[in-house]
Amino acid sequence: MSQLVWEIVKNNNAFLVKNNGVAFTTDPFSVTGRNTQVGLGFTHRHGVALKGGAKQAIATSLRKNQSHKVKKTGTIEAETLTVKGGVQRVAKVIRGRFQSKGLKQFALKKLVNFHRANVRAQANLKAESKAKKN
């Protein structure tokens, strides 16, 4: 089923961004960020979207597998988990969610990049607040 959906949306979808001949995607459930059949989150049953929270809480949106329900067009069913306790717990949730080793690796890589960006942002905020105090 996902092959049929990919053939329909590969050249025209709302998340498609082309830059210097390379096709990227802004799909929140994408695990690679590239416009490929493997990378698009809305064409597969599994996907993960990460959002930062307060005090090391990461809101993890997991795409639901609801093939038995009639789907409305234009909607993506997702459940949101707020995982407290750091990156290792979110990694455990992701490892339990994905069956394919390749997709699991891409999702874990997305988590690592997200965590690194959050650490840098928090360090920059601390440096700015120290500079304002002095």
Curated annotation (Swiss-Prot):
**Which domain of life does the UniProt lineage start with?**
Eukaryota
Q: Does the keyword Ribosomal protein apply?
A: yes
Any one GO MF term held by the record is: structural constituent of ribosome
Report any one BP term from Gene Ontology: translation
Membrane-spanning segments: none
Kindly state which keywords UniProt assigns to this record, in alphabetical order: Ribonucleoprotein, Ribosomal protein
Annotated Gene Ontology cellular component terms: ribonucleoprotein complex; ribosome
Which InterPro entries does the record cross-reference, listed alphabetically?
Answer: Ribosomal_eL28 (IPR002672), Ribosomal_eL28/Mak16 (IPR029004)
Query: What family is this?
Result: Belongs to the eukaryotic ribosomal protein eL28 family.
Q: What is this protein called?
A: Large ribosomal subunit protein eL28
